[in-house]
Amino acid sequence: MDYFNIKQNYYTGNFVQCLQEIEKFSKVTDNTLLFYKAKTLLALGQYQSQDPTSKLGKVLDLYVQFLDTKNIEELENLLKDKQNSPYELYLLATAQAILGDLDKSLETCVEGIDNDEAEGTTELLLLAIEVALLNNNVSTASTIFDNYTNAIEDTVSGDNEMILNLAESYIKFATNKETATSNFYYYEELSQTFPTWKTQLGLLNLHLQQRNIAEAQGIVELLLSDYYSVEQKENAVLYKPTFLANQITLALMQGLDTEDLTNQLVKLDHEHAFIKHHQEIDAKFDELVRKYDTSN
């Protein structure tokens, strides 16, 4: 089956269109359709149990339950038999990463990538790259990517090639490689071909990385326009925390006050990685001040 349009819309953040593509196969049942439908509904805040009779359906339900409770025990128990599909391991690894257990999450990803079942391994590879980069293991991310692509180079389908390109772009971004050439052109083309919040934010990050302040400001103003803020209001809500973090970064580069933007982000998502990172920096600074405060 051809999943290209489904995955294309999902990974460019066009979730409404992704659902429409999935509905074209309403008479077909398979794990890929179930996985992407559930993940898309979850992104839109519209999740409902899809197939509680199948193992993947049960795993999806327990994963959504975990997102609410942050209790991973039931999810782990269901998957302890080691006979799990890549999609099922994807959900477990994501839950482990959310809890901050990045090493264990990466182990789960690798277990699934080495699985004999091909369906879902490319998605799991992308997650492995994301987890490794979050854990500041750039060399690990590069090694996993190279090993995987070398092993399957003659059998890559179009829909999976798209995921591999995305994974490679993350590694290039993290290593600051080709930021003004191929990686930049990749995101520029995506944002022009699929003008969504996710693609524009990707391009915005590339401009911020290169300190292209005028171009970054242009994308901020574009995302504040009616086309994005009104006509794509579901995505506007979904990507608001990321957008605020980018706006704060840009404002700092411009020497502008960031208090209002920061307060908005804290109110919207006080656990956001940007906020936690700056809280850690502030804590270290305060510790240094106390250490060298000669008045004590």
UniProtKB/Swiss-Prot annotation:
The record's subcellular location field reads: Cytoplasm; Golgi apparatus membrane; Cytoplasmic vesicle, COPI-coated vesicle membrane
Its record classes its membrane topology as: Peripheral membrane protein
Q: What is its main location?
A: cytoplasm
Question: What does the UniProt keyword field contain?
Answer: Cytoplasm, Cytoplasmic vesicle, ER-Golgi transport, Golgi apparatus, Membrane, Protein transport, Transport
Q: Does the keyword Transport apply?
A: yes
Which interval of the chain is the signal sequence? none
Keyword Methyltransferase listed? The answer is no
Look up the domain of life of the source. Answer: Eukaryota
A biological process (GO) of this protein is: protein transport
Note the InterPro entries from the entry: Coatomer_esu, TPR-like_helical_dom_sf
Q: Which GO terms describe its cellular component?
A: COPI vesicle coat; Golgi membrane
Recorded GO MF terms: promoter-specific chromatin binding; structural molecule activity
| Subunit field text | Oligomeric complex that consists of at least the alpha, beta, beta', gamma, delta, epsilon and zeta subunits. Interacts with the ESCRT-0 subunit VPS27.
Family as reported in the entry's similarity comment: Belongs to the COPE family.
Query: Function, please?
Result: The coatomer is a cytosolic protein complex that binds to dilysine motifs and reversibly associates with Golgi non-clathrin-coated vesicles, which further mediate biosynthetic protein transport from the ER, via the Golgi up to the trans Golgi network. The coatomer complex is required for budding from Golgi membranes, and is essential for the retrograde Golgi-to-ER transport of dilysine-tagged proteins.
Which PANTHER family does the entry link to?
COATOMER SUBUNIT EPSILON (PTHR10805:SF0)
Q: What else is known?
A: Present with 23100 molecules/cell in log phase SD medium.
Descriptive protein name: Coatomer subunit epsilon
Gene from which the chain derives: SEC28
